[in-house]
Amino acid sequence: MSLMQFSGLLVVWLLSTLFIATLTWFEFRRVRFNFNVFFSLLFLLTFFFGFPLTSVLVFRFDVGVAPPEILLQALLSAACFYGVYYVTYKTRLRKRVVDVPRKPLFTMNRVETHLTWVILMGIALVSVAIFFMHNGFLLFRLHSYSQIFSSEVSGVALKRFFYFFIPAMLVVYFLRQDSKAWLFFLVSTVAFGLLTYMIVGGTRANIIIAFAIFLFIGIIRGWISLWMLAAAGVLGIVGMFWLALKRYGLNVSGDEAFYTFLYLTRDTFSPWENLALLLQNYHNIEFQGLAPIVRDFYVFIPTWLWPGRPSIVLNSANYFTWEVLNNHSGLAISPTLIGSLVVMGGALFIPLGAIVVGLIIKWFDWLYELGNREPNRYKAAILHSFCFGAIFNMIVLAREGLDSFVSRVVFFLVVFGASLLVAKLLFWLFDSAGLIHKRTTSLPQAQVEGKL
């Protein structure tokens, strides 16, 4: 890449970043937090944060990358995607009606709410315990990270249930919403994330999600400022780099350490070059249509229920890894959201996918506002827990693609909804058995005397 080509890419990158960052800043000033703000920051991180890292790798370490015209296509496709997404998100198809009384779909009381978070926590802890009994601490047993996906590890499906510890702790926080509950959320979820990191053998997702939710709650409540958020972001990047070194068993120093930091940070937070690789091999891609979305559900079907279930699931990530990169190491490499759309239907699917994503984020914001307006604090805690708990799925959406997001959000919805139903059933059983007693609040003495 010549300096002239780099200068052109830099101008496009600066304009695109400024465009998205400006819209995000105005939205932040208006509402302080909603899921449009979160997705916009996540989109910036995924598709634009990596460009400076790539530039340093190219000019400092002479690392080979896709041709400049392909990198330009990747930057422009990301900017155009966000433009279509933003217009879709802001467009109202019907007039907004405020304060119209509607019959609630469901309601919650104190006992049902506490039962719900206990059930969610139980699902996570029992899954971790069973996985540990089968495999022990994989971080200290395995020699490479790819072995996690080998036949040496049993009960891999249980990992999908670990995450429900976070929405359980979110319910606990939203019932109190004070600084002590906020700090308790951080300590409990990060401790659980470190435990699963050691047991699973290097999975950092639970730690990243817990820390991100903690920061956004702090921003919403005004407990942390923007400069504190930036400092925490730098700390998070360094922390993720250290965990990655431990995961891959790397011992580096000097220039090698700087090089390793650059490419691991890029691959962890901003795999934008994967989109460029897909565009570079565009003519070799056999468009998969909507099949990757259907195939991604296969992993949730147990083999005893479907004996002939394919052992290899050809979703967009695996198609990119196996067919485009010809990589059969056992790891699935993230194609990114736009990359998954390219795999499914080429360039035509990019604006269509942007419209779908805009509607998805709009729905989450509607649910979040519903929780903000809800007078029943127990129901509000459940709604907010569901919305913030789905942050993991939004990260999957940006990094892994639309197919992975759809299967995971449906799975999350089913497990969360089942926990609610079980909590309501248990409450009905306890109430029928006479085990539920209403709390009686005694009036202060002076107030009682005034009524006599």
UniProtKB/Swiss-Prot annotation:
One of its GO terms (biological process) is enterobacterial common antigen biosynthetic process. Keywords: Cell inner membrane, Cell membrane, Membrane, Transmembrane, Transmembrane helix. GO terms for cellular component: plasma membrane. It is found in: Cell inner membrane. Its main location: membrane. It comes from the Bacteria. Probably part of a complex composed of WzxE, WzyE and WzzE. Belongs to the WzyE family. This is Probable ECA polymerase. It comes from Salmonella typhimurium (strain LT2 / SGSC1412 / ATCC 700720).
